[in-house]
Amino acid sequence: MANHKSSIKRIRQTNARRLRNRYYAKTARNAMKVLRATEDKNEAQALFPKVCSMLDKLAKKNVIHKNKAGNLKSKLAKHVNALA
């Protein structure tokens, strides 16, 4: 266990940040799963900007790497465009 007040606070902050990041990352993963499962093109086109926005926010906050966000958005765009 940490001895200094500042390190105790830092551990507390890190844990809170980790939980927050996990929540937002999981929410985005679930949204991507829903988008990939959609077969209706109109519904997918409505969901796509929301999911892209989530990914951009995660990349901006360094929860995921910006290149990973770009790759995921690209794959999702391919999926949406492939729907009939």
UniProtKB/Swiss-Prot annotation:
GO biological process, one term: translation
Pfam families named among the record's database cross-references: Ribosomal_S20p (PF01649)
InterPro entries xrefs: Ribosomal_bS20 (IPR002583), Ribosomal_bS20_sf (IPR036510)
Keywords: Ribonucleoprotein, Ribosomal protein, RNA-binding, rRNA-binding
GO cellular component: cytosol; small ribosomal subunit
One of the record's GO molecular function terms: structural constituent of ribosome
Summary of the function given for this chain in its UniProt record: Binds directly to 16S ribosomal RNA.
Record family assignment: Belongs to the bacterial ribosomal protein bS20 family.
HAMAP family, alphabetized: Ribosomal_bS20
The protein's name: Small ribosomal subunit protein bS20
Taxonomic source organism: Parabacteroides distasonis (strain ATCC 8503 / DSM 20701 / CIP 104284 / JCM 5825 / NCTC 11152)
Gene name in the database record: rpsT
